[in-house]
Amino acid sequence: MKKLAILGATGSIGDSTLSVCRSNPELYQITLLAASSSVDKMLALCREFTPLYVSMSSEISAKKLRGLLKRNNLSCHVLDDEQRLLELLASDHVDSVMAAIVGAAGLKTTLAAVDAGKEVFLANKEALVMSGALFIDAVKKSGAKLWPVDSEHNAIYQALSPKLQNTIGACDLSGEGVSKILLTGSGGPFLEKPLAEFAAITPAQAVKHPNWSMGKKISIDSATMMNKGLEYIEARWLFNANKEQLQIIIHPQSVIHSMVQYKDGSVIAQMGNPNMRIPIAYVLGGEQRIESGTDFLDFFAAPDFSFTAPDFDRYPCLKLAIDACFEGQQSTTILNAANEIAVEAFLNQTIKFTQISQLVERVLNQHESAAIESVEHLLEIDTEARLSASEIIKRDYLC
């Protein structure tokens, strides 16, 4: 039985991971759960899974959880120190790590697991978007086993040969007969909405994805298609793809999760209902297929498939991400940081929906390119970009 750490345990991916673990209790012992501040939810998880360790990034939440655990006669060790969490991830208490902390906040923990040579289930796309070559170099150096969890990258992975699956980050796509990776996206809730109405879009409208049940941040990213842009960058690094080997296709039904086109004209697609428990079950099962607890795809009830090219006037964030992808790690780090600030501001109704892309572009244009030498350097750039975005909001974009 493997020892599993779940980072982002109280979020959407954490929920789905724990659901799959419930269906397959013989596979994993959950030894570490990490979250930000959801004390009541974490208490319930401690009751059910009895992890050895719990990490809360909020000191106040950690203190509250300690008191509740004591009152309930539960003996989990509660941490509120990031360094201790990083040490635990590298220890013998952990074999496998579900890296599902949203945003740049998950970079250090994900890299700690990689550096320690752990089996890493990568659900935090921002970590790879920011660190790119540094991340892949760390995987190669440590020998960590990297499994893509995002439904699209998981679909691509399943459609590749075993040789390519075993060379994540250094794939020779052309040498193995791959012509192109076809990355699908639904187009979000505003695929048909008139562009003239975009400025009036509310957070409540934007978080209602037509097919997927997700957290607020990723739902907004799906509405702007920044999420697909981040996935484009992630695919570039995971599969060592060049610009000619990556294509984004709008597929509103979200049944085909991505495809791989081969040189002989064949296209291999991975399909299934839009439920994250399916790719999570795939990575948790490793070499075997396991129960995900989801319904099978009903081909007789499934909608007709449709495909179209993305409209960059409708999705300017997608264009910004594609352009940043091959400009270097500084650009992708700034893109991600500025977007996180912009999405938070939109959710707080401080800026308009249309100002998300405007803000990201302005922050990108403020910074000159520079060579990235370390993760610490990346985090400095990340901080600078966040400050720039916040200053622009205060100065120019208050609704």
UniProtKB/Swiss-Prot annotation:
It is an enzyme of class 1 (oxidoreductase). One of its GO terms (molecular function) is manganese ion binding. Its EC number is 1.1.1.267. Gene3D superfamilies: 1.10.1740.10, NAD(P)-binding Rossmann-like Domain (3.40.50.720). Its cofactor is Mg(2+); Mn(2+). The keyword NADP applies. One of its GO terms (biological process) is isopentenyl diphosphate biosynthetic process, methylerythritol 4-phosphate pathway involved in terpenoid biosynthetic process. NADPH binds at residues 10-13, 124, 126, 215. Mn(2+) binds at residues 150, 152, 231. Pfam families: DXP_redisom_C (PF08436), DXP_reductoisom (PF02670), DXPR_C (PF13288). Keywords: Isoprene biosynthesis, Manganese, Metal-binding, NADP, Oxidoreductase. Pathway: Isoprenoid biosynthesis; isopentenyl diphosphate biosynthesis via DXP pathway; isopentenyl diphosphate from 1-deoxy-D-xylulose 5-phosphate: step 1/6. It catalyses: 2-C-methyl-D-erythritol 4-phosphate + NADP(+) = 1-deoxy-D-xylulose 5-phosphate + NADPH + H(+). 1-deoxy-D-xylulose 5-phosphate binds at residues 125, 151-152, 186, 209, 222, 227-228, 231. The keyword Ubl conjugation does not apply. Belongs to the DXR family. NCBIfam families: Dxr (TIGR00243), PRK05447.1-1 (NF003938). This is 1-deoxy-D-xylulose 5-phosphate reductoisomerase. It comes from Psychromonas ingrahamii (strain DSM 17664 / CCUG 51855 / 37).
